[in-house]
């Protein structure tokens, strides 16, 4: 009930999208209840690498709930299983912790491991690498999402600068 109240407050304040943490034991029943209470809200879930490809049936059920994306559902270093998952569901997979370098991003794009990429400049080696990842994603027609990791004001400014590029 507390979660539903917080979501109601966010919806009332006009937040365009709501991100929910999704983990074993706090997953499908919770998400179904949220969707039932807020049928028109835009949600995405962040799994923080909490699942494996053996949970494919769970993600097929999540697919029915019409989410904007599923962020980092599987282990961060398993781009192959992310590709298998993305081919098996219609909801876009967004890679986050998997994107630690330009090379990792290029490999994810090559394997079709996702349909969104969350770029964190602090994780990928700074703004120059973040822009290279953005450009590779744009060329592959994969939209980007910018995230932060509790940066300083300088780091936050990098995130804002990056978010102004055309593929965000």
Where do the PLM segments sit?
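Catalytic domains of carbohydrate-active enzymes, especially glycoside hydrolases
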Residues: 9-21
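Short helix/strand-capping turn motifs
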Residues: 167-168
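Active-site glycine-rich loop that binds ribose-phosphate moieties when present
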Residues: 2-6
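Catalytic core of soluble alpha/beta enzymes
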Residues: 20, 25-157
């Amino acid at each position: 009930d507390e979660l539903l109240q917080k979501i109601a407050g966010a919806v009332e304040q006009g937040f365009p999208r709501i991100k929910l943490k999704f983990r074993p034991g706090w997953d499908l029943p919770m998400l179904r209840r949220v969707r039932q209470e807020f049928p028109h809200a835009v949600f995405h879930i962040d799994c923080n690498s909490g699942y494996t490809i053996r949970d494919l049936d769970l993600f097929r059920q999540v697919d029915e709930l019409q989410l904007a994306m599923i962020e980092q559902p599987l282990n961060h270093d398993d781009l192959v299983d992310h590709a298998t998952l993305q081919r098996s569901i219609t909801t876009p997979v967004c890679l986050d912790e998997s994107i630690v370098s330009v090379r990792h991003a290029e490999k994810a794009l090559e394997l079709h491991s996702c349909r969104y990429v969350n770029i964190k400049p602090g994780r990928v080696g700074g703004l120059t690498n973040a822009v290279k990842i953005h450009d590779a994603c744009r060329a592959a027609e994969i939209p980007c999402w910018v995230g932060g990791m509790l940066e300083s004001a300088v780091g936050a400014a990098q995130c804002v600068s990056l978010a102004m590029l055309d593929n965000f």
